[in-house]
Amino acid sequence: MKVILLEELEGRGSFGDIITVKDGFANNYLIPRKLALPATEGNIKHIQSILSQKARKLEKIRTQAQELAKKLDGAEITIKKPVGQNGKLFGAITTSDIAKALNEKGFNVDKKQIIISSPIKNLGLYTIKVRLHNDIYASIKVNVEEQK
Protein backbone atom coordinates (compact mmCIF):
# COMPACT_ATOMS: atom_id res chain seq x y z
CA MET A 1 0.00 0.00 0.00
CA LYS A 2 1.29 3.47 -0.85
CA VAL A 3 1.11 6.08 1.90
CA ILE A 4 2.18 9.70 2.35
CA LEU A 5 4.21 10.29 5.48
CA LEU A 6 3.02 13.04 7.82
CA GLU A 7 6.06 12.78 10.09
CA GLU A 8 9.62 11.61 9.72
CA LEU A 9 9.94 7.86 10.11
CA GLU A 10 13.46 6.71 10.80
CA GLY A 11 14.76 4.66 7.91
CA ARG A 12 11.60 5.19 5.86
CA GLY A 13 11.35 8.87 4.89
CA SER A 14 10.24 12.33 5.98
CA PHE A 15 7.13 14.52 5.72
CA GLY A 16 5.52 14.36 2.30
CA ASP A 17 7.40 11.29 1.07
CA ILE A 18 5.32 8.63 -0.66
CA ILE A 19 6.43 5.16 0.38
CA THR A 20 5.18 1.63 -0.12
CA VAL A 21 4.48 -0.40 3.02
CA LYS A 22 2.57 -3.56 3.82
CA ASP A 23 -1.20 -3.09 4.17
CA GLY A 24 -1.25 -4.21 7.80
CA PHE A 25 1.52 -1.76 8.80
CA ALA A 26 -0.34 1.09 7.11
CA ASN A 27 -3.84 0.24 8.37
CA ASN A 28 -2.93 -0.85 11.90
CA TYR A 29 -0.03 1.46 12.76
CA LEU A 30 0.71 4.41 10.47
CA ILE A 31 -2.78 5.67 9.63
CA PRO A 32 -4.39 5.29 13.11
CA ARG A 33 -1.44 7.11 14.72
CA LYS A 34 -1.69 9.88 12.09
CA LEU A 35 1.84 9.17 10.90
CA ALA A 36 0.65 8.68 7.30
CA LEU A 37 -2.27 9.09 4.92
CA PRO A 38 -3.31 6.79 2.09
CA ALA A 39 -1.69 8.02 -1.15
CA THR A 40 -4.87 9.11 -2.93
CA GLU A 41 -4.87 11.88 -5.54
CA GLY A 42 -6.61 14.29 -3.17
CA ASN A 43 -4.20 13.60 -0.32
CA ILE A 44 -1.19 13.98 -2.63
CA LYS A 45 -2.42 17.39 -3.84
CA HIS A 46 -3.12 18.48 -0.26
CA ILE A 47 0.37 17.52 0.94
CA GLN A 48 1.99 19.15 -2.11
CA SER A 49 0.19 22.42 -1.32
CA ILE A 50 1.40 22.23 2.29
CA LEU A 51 4.97 21.58 1.10
CA SER A 52 4.85 24.52 -1.33
CA GLN A 53 3.54 26.82 1.44
CA LYS A 54 6.39 25.71 3.71
CA ALA A 55 8.91 26.30 0.92
CA ARG A 56 7.58 29.82 0.29
CA LYS A 57 7.66 30.60 4.02
CA LEU A 58 11.25 29.34 4.35
CA GLU A 59 12.31 31.35 1.30
CA LYS A 60 10.73 34.49 2.77
CA ILE A 61 12.56 33.95 6.08
CA ARG A 62 15.82 33.32 4.22
CA THR A 63 15.38 36.50 2.14
CA GLN A 64 14.71 38.55 5.28
CA ALA A 65 17.82 37.07 6.90
CA GLN A 66 19.93 37.97 3.84
CA GLU A 67 18.63 41.55 3.89
CA LEU A 68 19.38 41.86 7.60
CA ALA A 69 22.86 40.39 7.03
CA LYS A 70 23.61 43.07 4.41
CA LYS A 71 22.56 45.84 6.82
CA LEU A 72 24.25 44.28 9.83
CA ASP A 73 27.55 43.24 8.21
CA GLY A 74 30.28 45.60 9.37
CA ALA A 75 28.05 47.47 11.82
CA GLU A 76 29.82 48.78 14.89
CA ILE A 77 28.34 49.11 18.34
CA THR A 78 29.88 50.61 21.44
CA ILE A 79 29.26 49.24 24.90
CA LYS A 80 30.43 51.16 27.94
CA LYS A 81 31.08 49.36 31.22
CA PRO A 82 32.79 50.29 34.50
CA VAL A 83 36.44 49.28 34.71
CA GLY A 84 38.57 48.30 37.70
CA GLN A 85 42.07 49.52 38.54
CA ASN A 86 43.80 46.84 36.49
CA GLY A 87 41.88 47.68 33.29
CA LYS A 88 39.49 44.74 33.49
CA LEU A 89 35.74 45.12 33.34
CA PHE A 90 33.51 44.72 36.35
CA GLY A 91 31.47 41.76 35.14
CA ALA A 92 31.57 40.88 31.45
CA ILE A 93 29.96 41.68 28.12
CA THR A 94 27.60 38.84 27.25
CA THR A 95 25.40 38.01 24.28
CA SER A 96 22.52 39.74 26.09
CA ASP A 97 24.45 43.02 26.24
CA ILE A 98 25.35 42.81 22.55
CA ALA A 99 21.76 41.95 21.55
CA LYS A 100 20.44 44.87 23.61
CA ALA A 101 22.87 47.28 21.92
CA LEU A 102 21.94 45.96 18.46
CA ASN A 103 18.21 46.26 19.21
CA GLU A 104 18.75 49.87 20.34
CA LYS A 105 20.33 50.53 16.92
CA GLY A 106 17.25 49.08 15.20
CA PHE A 107 18.49 45.57 14.40
CA ASN A 108 16.11 42.84 15.52
CA VAL A 109 18.58 40.26 16.84
CA ASP A 110 18.08 37.69 19.61
CA LYS A 111 20.89 36.89 22.06
CA LYS A 112 20.81 33.25 20.89
CA GLN A 113 21.91 34.36 17.42
CA ILE A 114 25.13 35.96 18.67
CA ILE A 115 28.19 33.73 18.66
CA ILE A 116 31.00 34.40 21.13
CA SER A 117 33.29 31.75 22.57
CA SER A 118 33.41 33.35 26.01
CA PRO A 119 32.15 36.56 27.61
CA ILE A 120 34.24 39.67 26.87
CA LYS A 121 36.13 40.80 29.98
CA ASN A 122 38.58 43.38 28.60
CA LEU A 123 38.41 46.73 26.84
CA GLY A 124 38.95 46.79 23.09
CA LEU A 125 37.47 46.12 19.68
CA TYR A 126 36.06 42.66 18.99
CA THR A 127 34.65 41.06 15.85
CA ILE A 128 31.55 39.00 16.62
CA LYS A 129 29.55 36.70 14.35
CA VAL A 130 25.75 36.80 14.28
CA ARG A 131 23.92 33.75 12.91
CA LEU A 132 20.78 34.97 11.16
CA HIS A 133 19.74 31.72 9.46
CA ASN A 134 21.14 28.21 8.98
CA ASP A 135 23.98 29.38 6.75
CA ILE A 136 23.66 33.18 6.81
CA TYR A 137 26.08 35.02 9.08
CA ALA A 138 27.00 38.66 9.60
CA SER A 139 30.08 40.09 11.31
CA ILE A 140 29.78 43.05 13.62
CA LYS A 141 32.34 45.02 15.57
CA VAL A 142 31.86 45.51 19.29
CA ASN A 143 33.86 48.32 20.84
CA VAL A 144 34.12 47.99 24.62
CA GLU A 145 34.95 51.30 26.31
CA GLU A 146 35.34 52.52 29.86
CA GLN A 147 32.25 54.06 31.42
CA LYS A 148 33.17 57.35 33.07
Curated annotation (Swiss-Prot):
Annotated Gene Ontology cellular component terms: ribonucleoprotein complex; ribosome
InterPro entries reported for this sequence: Ribosomal_bL9, Ribosomal_bL9/RNase_H1_N, Ribosomal_bL9_bac/chp, Ribosomal_bL9_C, Ribosomal_bL9_C_sf, Ribosomal_bL9_N, Ribosomal_bL9_N_sf
A molecular-function term among this protein's GO annotations: structural constituent of ribosome
Organism: Hydrogenobaculum sp. (strain Y04AAS1)
Intrachain disulfide bonds: none
Name of the protein described by the UniProt record: Large ribosomal subunit protein bL9
SUPFAM superfamilies: L9 N-domain-like, Ribosomal protein L9 C-domain
Parts of the chain that traverse the membrane: none
Keyword line: Ribonucleoprotein, Ribosomal protein, RNA-binding, rRNA-binding
Keyword rRNA-binding belongs to the record: yes
Entries under HAMAP family matching the protein: Ribosomal_bL9
